[in-house]
């Protein structure tokens, strides 16, 4: 009994015991508070690891970027050991992917100057440019930068064979991005591996003005794809942040889809 008691006490006071404080630098709320360098340094001095990855492979730099901390703070974090510019984080993405996601072109340029690779593909099959497109980035300067640094707008496609114009289609609000990508050489009638064109992808976003615009441009919208799917099916997918309402399906039905 005495031996069992000693073992229990050893476990109770072990640094791995459940009562141990977690790394505050992995707490997203901490980065929402926009901490100062002094606050960050204090946390590090108190034993919080500035380069630790959580169970989903996000680290303090990721959270600082995603919570819109000043670039000077982010640069400071990147300067710390273990936070190399090409460090692999969630979904095999490096910091420049998260900068792209947050429309943070100055940070993207800084990371590039530090040696950030521009030709990586994440674990879901998205290049840097296509990650920007599939997350709805509308700032063409982001894409200009990617193209300037070697991205191939006509050949970079995701695992489904979708180009950046198709990927961004659910998020477009007018013809700006359509004109932008077609001016770079993408054919508005391009399709993915299953034969889905821009109308199907736009249906995910449910913007009737955009779909009308595409119809007026002469794109196909009633046809079935190679697996007998159509715009109605794509509308049911919605996007990560929104689902289509009944009005979208009534609109598509009125088109004969």
What label would you give each PLM region?
Residues 41-49, 75-84, 109-117, 144-153, ...:
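Ankyrin repeat domain, specifically the short helix-to-loop turn at the C-terminus of the second helix
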Residues 35, 68-69, 103, 136-138, ...:
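Ankyrin-repeat intra-repeat helix-capping/turn positions
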Residues 39, 72-73, 106-107, 138-142, ...:
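Conserved ankyrin/ankyrin-like repeat signature
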Residues 170-257:
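Acidic, serine/threonine- and glycine-rich low-complexity intrinsically disordered segments
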Residues 21-31, 52-65, 86-98, 121-133, ...:
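Ankyrin-repeat boundary/"N-cap" motif
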Residues 107-201:
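Long, acidic/polar, low-complexity amphipathic helices and coiled-coil-like
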Residues 1-26:
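Bacterial Sec-dependent N-terminal signal peptides
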């Amino acid at each position: 009994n005495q031996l069992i008691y000693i073992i229990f006490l050893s476990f109770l006071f072990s640094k791995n015991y459940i009562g141990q404080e977690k790394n505050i630098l992995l707490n997203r709320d901490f980065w929402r508070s926009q901490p100062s360098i002094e606050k960050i340094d204090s946390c590090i001095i108190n034993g919080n690891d500035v380069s630790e990855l959580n169970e989903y492979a996000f680290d303090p730099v990721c959270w600082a970027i995603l919570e819109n901390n000043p670039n000077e703070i982010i640069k400071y974090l990147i300067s710390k050991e273990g936070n190399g510019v090409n460090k692999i984080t969630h979904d095999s993405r490096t910091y420049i992917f998260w900068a792209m996601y947050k429309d943070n072109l100055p940070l993207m340029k800084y990371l590039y100057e530090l040696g950030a690779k521009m030709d990586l593909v994440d674990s879901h099959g998205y290049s840097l440019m296509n990650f920007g497109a599939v997350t709805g980035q509308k700032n063409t300067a982001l894409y200009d930068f990617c193209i300037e640094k070697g991205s191939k707008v006509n050949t970079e496609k995701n695992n489904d064979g979708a180009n950046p114009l198709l990927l961004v289609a659910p998020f477009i609000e007018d013809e700006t991005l359509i004109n932008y990508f077609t001016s770079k050489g993408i054919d508005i009638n391009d399709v993915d591996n299953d034969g889905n064109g821009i109308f199907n992808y736009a249906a995910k976003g449910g913007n009737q003005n955009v779909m009308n615009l595409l119809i007026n441009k002469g794109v196909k919208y009633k046809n079935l794809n190679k697996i007998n799917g159509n715009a109605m099916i794509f509308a049911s997918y919605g996007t990560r942040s929104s689902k289509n309402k009944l009005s979208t399906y009534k609109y598509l039905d009125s088109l004969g889809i």
